[in-house]
Amino acid sequence: MSKKLISIVDVKDYVGQEVTIGAWVANKSGKGKIAFVQLRDGSAFFQGVAFKPNFIEKYGEESGLEKFDVIKRLNQETSVYVTGIVKEDERSKFGYELDITDLEIIGESHEYPITPKEHGTDFLMDNRHLWLRSRKQMAVMQIRNAIIYATYEFFDQNGFIKFDSPILSENAAEDSTELFETDYFGKPAFLSQSGQLYLEAGAMALGRVFDFGPVFRAEKSKTRRHLTEFWMMDAEYSFLSHEESLDLQEAYVKALIQGVLDRAPQALDILERDVEALKRYITEPFKRVSYDDAITLLQEHEADEDTDYEHLEHGDDFGSPHETWISNYFGVPTFVVNYPASFKAFYMKPVPGNPERVLCADLLAPEGYGEIIGGSMREDNYDALVAKMDELGMDKSEYDFYLDLRKYGSVPHGGFGIGIERMVTFVAGTKHIREAIPFPRMLHRIRP
């Protein structure tokens, strides 16, 4: 095959011309003198049509029938070079169609296990390496790519520097009960839960920094919102106030949604996502409500017919049903700010005049998707941080470098983190986080 290949996504530029496409057979149908071949090449899907009389006319009866028979016998996922004339076709769901003039098989496909019918979740996850080829799974990956692209673009435009934090560490950033431990030349080491502590060092050097990479949490959870390995974007910045941080987070999330609308509209269409809702999340301001006001709201509405959550008192943490109700009540992504210090991380700065609350925020996505961002102002006073660590019985020697940051020109600073898979799930409108990453790692699943 010596002809120049084009991508399916570019066929609109070749109407009336003969082109060659390298693709896989996603499906086929037809009978008698006509065969329909649905093609995919990673950029998009496209339909080719083969007419038996045309093949006989071009190649002669014997060769024409042989070539047409090859097309009729194609198995799903056979890889091919297919040549034909691009035609506009309003009747086609793709908008264009390929009048096939030739087809060459590159790689035969055996009987493909994932056929166009319903399959159980365990079967699909066992065959994840093949399930990724389906239209909806490809669409989710395209949305993931658009979100990652928009992340780098946003932080570059806002003066942040990419700062890589280590994957291996000897201490924990968050809950030490959720660590994966490994041997590091005879010493215990842990897979990173977050790059935050190291990013704070970066912010003291470079002002505004972010990292993006895999993190690991040994959560024995089987919910639709948890993975043991996922990708996290953490950002850290100096000299920003809490309100300015919330403004930045809101702008970031809106930039991610806009990035998907711009770069992957066809993926949203395949997934039948409510695009008007996504546009509204961009145009309308996010809501901001204090933790205590949110608790009061929950208490006032817990007897409503359409509520389904347990009673909470001030000082209790939210569960998923509470987060869902809060975000749906306001109808847009909602910041819940100033949680109790009792169940938040040691490094969070107290609310001035109210040491029982901390300057933090969780961003709750509507439509039942829950928390997608967590952030806070960091305690920048050395003595206050030491006192908090003593109160919690923490070994300060494990955090000597972190404490040093408060001894040499400490400044007000804060940061936030977003689990990319949760954002992908929200924007894509899918039901389970396992579809938001190519090969999910969950409780009881570490292959393929």
From Swiss-Prot:
CC annotations in GO: cytoplasm
Stretches that traverse the bilayer: none
Matches recorded under InterPro entries: Aa-tRNA-synt_II (IPR004364), aa-tRNA-synth_II (IPR006195), aa-tRNA-synth_II/BPL/LPL (IPR045864), Asn-tRNA-ligase (IPR004522), Asp/Asn-tRNA-synth_IIb (IPR002312), NA-bd_OB-fold (IPR012340), NA-bd_OB_tRNA (IPR004365)
Catalytic reaction list: tRNA(Asn) + L-asparagine + ATP = L-asparaginyl-tRNA(Asn) + AMP + diphosphate + H(+)
Molecular function terms from GO: asparagine-tRNA ligase activity; ATP binding; catalytic activity, acting on a protein; nucleic acid binding; transferase activity
A single GO BP: asparaginyl-tRNA aminoacylation
Keywords: Aminoacyl-tRNA synthetase, ATP-binding, Cytoplasm, Ligase, Nucleotide-binding, Protein biosynthesis
Enzyme type, top EC level: ligase
Subcellular localization: Cytoplasm
Superkingdom per UniProt: Bacteria
Protein EC: 6.1.1.22
Subunit structure: Homodimer.
The name this protein goes by in its record: Asparagine--tRNA ligase
Organism: Streptococcus pyogenes serotype M1
Gene this chain is encoded by: asnS
